[in-house]
Amino acid sequence: MTRQAVPKPAYEDLVDCQSAMFEWAESFDSKDWDRLSACLAPTLFLDYSDIMGKKWDALPVEEFIGMASSPHFLGNARIKTQHFIGASKWTQPDEGQIVGFHQMRVAHQKYGDDELKQVLYHGHAHGKATTYYRNVGGQWKFAGLVPDVRWTEFDCDKIFEH
């Protein structure tokens, strides 16, 4: 059986995409929306069918940041997360785009008080994520995400209830 060659990105481009992915995850978890804005492409492809039942082909960056920073989502100061990225593989379907495939575990904790002492719920999502990167003005930017949640633990479904 022969395998068809899958185009792979150059090492320097891959490192730049890993950096954009790190900035995306860290800005989500630290709720640093300016930092998030700096690593994103002008529009994003998002398929959140698994987690929100929604999909966007070209969501403007401002709308994405507004959604992410909403008090009903990650902008809620009583919700803490960690987006942990495991093993990855990468392809480059064309000169201006790179696609990453990553093992993911996302830990969530929701508190009942502003001092973050009373834990109401905790839940973890396990699966993989397909991420997209676009070369914008010579710099690789995070340009899309398709989470694939395989299973969850604890009260993951209650974290974003309001």
From Swiss-Prot:
Its EC number is 4.2.1.-. Pfam families: Scytalone_dh. It comes from the Eukaryota. Keywords: Lyase. GO terms for biological process: melanin metabolic process. Pathway: Pigment biosynthesis. InterPro entries: NTF2-like_dom_sf, Scytalone_dehydratase, Scytalone_dh. One of its GO terms (molecular function) is scytalone dehydratase activity. The active site is at H83, H108. Substrate binds at Y48. The keyword Lyase applies. SUPFAM superfamilies: NTF2-like. Induction: Expression is positively regulated by the transcriptional regulator wor1. Expression is down-regulated during biotrophic growth within tomato leaves. The keyword Iron-sulfur does not apply. Belongs to the scytalone dehydratase family. Scytalone dehydratase-like protein; part of the gene cluster that mediates the biosynthesis of the bianthraquinone cladofulvin, a conidial pigment not required for virulence but that plays a role in fitness and resistance to environmental stresses including UV light and low-temperature stress. The pathway begins with the synthesis of atrochrysone thioester by the polyketide synthase (PKS) claG. The atrochrysone carboxyl ACP thioesterase claF then breaks the thioester bond and releases the atrochrysone carboxylic acid from claG. This is Scytalone dehydratase-like protein claB. It comes from Passalora fulva. The gene is claB.
